[in-house]
Amino acid sequence: MPVAALIREEIEIPANVNVEINGNTVAVKSGAKELKRDLLYPGIEISTEDGKVVIECTFPRKAQTAIVGTYRSHIQNMIKGVTDGFEYKLVIRYAHFPMKVSAKGNTVMIDNFLGEKYTRTAKIMDGVTVKVSGEEVIVSGANKEFVGQTAANIEQATKVKGRDTRIFQDGIYIVEKAGKVL
């Protein structure tokens, strides 16, 4: 089976975005938003030339081919994060006991879930903002992974255990992630 001698992926850098590569660290900056990420894998080179980020690998193996595509996606997400940002929408659902959800500091507090006396909490990751308005929770930020993890933390905090989930459907659920309706 023929083997590619070179894999090369190019990513266009928008006019208002600055990309710096220092060793293995890729830094993407636009205005006040900045994201940094270490991208290190043997045989893979990342550089900038002519307004593009170039990811190259000579005589790649199967794993290196996959990592080149992964790095391309990471850098594209970083560029999109500093320009547009990412937003997840969650919806609060309850049948009998009305939940009270609030965001303070780096935690989301959920009171009166299924009539419980104690407060359930979920961690908010760095650089992520959470807004609660009525029956909707909006999680937004520049780092796609941190926004997704914060939304997952909120959803997991209201997971029903020890009861039939077909009957007890109370909770906070992700209904839209990064523009895709679920």
UniProtKB/Swiss-Prot annotation:
<dbReference type="InterPro" id="IPR020040">
    <property type="entry name" value="Ribosomal_uL6_a/b-dom"/>
</dbReference>
<dbReference type="InterPro" id="IPR002359">
    <property type="entry name" value="Ribosomal_uL6_CS2"/>
</dbReference>
<dbReference type="GO" id="GO:0019843">
    <property type="term" value="F:rRNA binding"/>
</dbReference>
<dbReference type="InterPro" id="IPR036789">
    <property type="entry name" value="Ribosomal_uL6-like_a/b-dom_sf"/>
</dbReference>
<keyword id="KW-0689">Ribosomal protein</keyword>
<dbReference type="Pfam" id="PF00347">
    <property type="entry name" value="Ribosomal_L6"/>
</dbReference>
<dbReference type="InterPro" id="IPR019907">
    <property type="entry name" value="Ribosomal_uL6_arc"/>
</dbReference>
<comment type="similarity">
    <text>Belongs to the universal ribosomal protein uL6 family.</text>
</comment>
<comment type="subunit">
    <text>Part of the 50S ribosomal subunit.</text>
</comment>
<dbReference type="GO" id="GO:0003735">
    <property type="term" value="F:structural constituent of ribosome"/>
</dbReference>
<protein>
    <recommendedName>
        <fullName>Large ribosomal subunit protein uL6</fullName>
    </recommendedName>
</protein>
<dbReference type="GO" id="GO:0022625">
    <property type="term" value="C:cytosolic large ribosomal subunit"/>
</dbReference>
<dbReference type="InterPro" id="IPR000702">
    <property type="entry name" value="Ribosomal_uL6-like"/>
</dbReference>
<keyword id="KW-0699">rRNA-binding</keyword>
<dbReference type="GO" id="GO:0002181">
    <property type="term" value="P:cytoplasmic translation"/>
</dbReference>
<comment type="function">
    <text>This protein binds to the 23S rRNA, and is important in its secondary structure. It is located near the subunit interface in the base of the L7/L12 stalk, and near the tRNA binding site of the peptidyltransferase center.</text>
</comment>
<keyword id="KW-0687">Ribonucleoprotein</keyword>
<keyword id="KW-0694">RNA-binding</keyword>
